[in-house]
Amino acid sequence: MNIIYLHGFKSNSNSIKGKLLQHYCAKYPEIQVHLPDLNMSPNAAIAYVSGLIESMHDVALLGSSLGGFYATHLVAQHAVPAVLINPAMRPWQLFRELFDEQLPYQVHPKWCLDEADLVQLQQLALPVAQDADKILVLLQQGDEVLDYREAHLSLIHI
């Protein structure tokens, strides 16, 4: 089993959640955890993870925040199972609200969020999550940035 952890916005492949997942799964030699760095444009991130999925067998995704948004697209594209942790459902709107005056916004030394990224995010959005039977959604109140109710309403059919 290969688990690909998709980190959230302003995070990276060394995130605490990813490292905890890797540490926990180390007890199970049949599970390999992959922690790709997704600090790149949305289209590049999707292409990169798609390449990983296509190069492996028995793949599942675990996506947090922006990584959860990416996972919904990747499930539809590759029919792999996914767990979404407080997924961002309309990140282009959220980022515009948070950073509109500051675009381009330096997210990471390797990536500046700009208007083209917001357009890419909107184009990646699905009106309804596809392959809903392959998705488990975990929501928690109290997230400092994301309102769990938005994900709940967007994914209520799952």
Task: Outline where the language-model segments fall.
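Gly/Ala-rich beta-loop-alpha elbow adjacent to hydrolase catalytic centers
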Residues: L62-G67, A71
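Conserved alpha/beta-hydrolase "acid-adjacent" motif
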Residues: E144-E150
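Active-site nucleophile loop of the alpha/beta-hydrolase fold
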Residues: L38, L84-W92
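Active-site catalytic motif of lipid deacylating hydrolases and related acyltransferases
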Residues: M1-M56
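Short beta-strand/loop motif that positions the catalytic acidic residue
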Residues: V137-L139
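Conserved small/polar residues in nucleotide/adenosyl-binding loops
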Residues: I156-I158
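Active-site nucleophile elbow and catalytic-triad environment of alpha/beta-hydrolase enzymes
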Residues: P109-V128
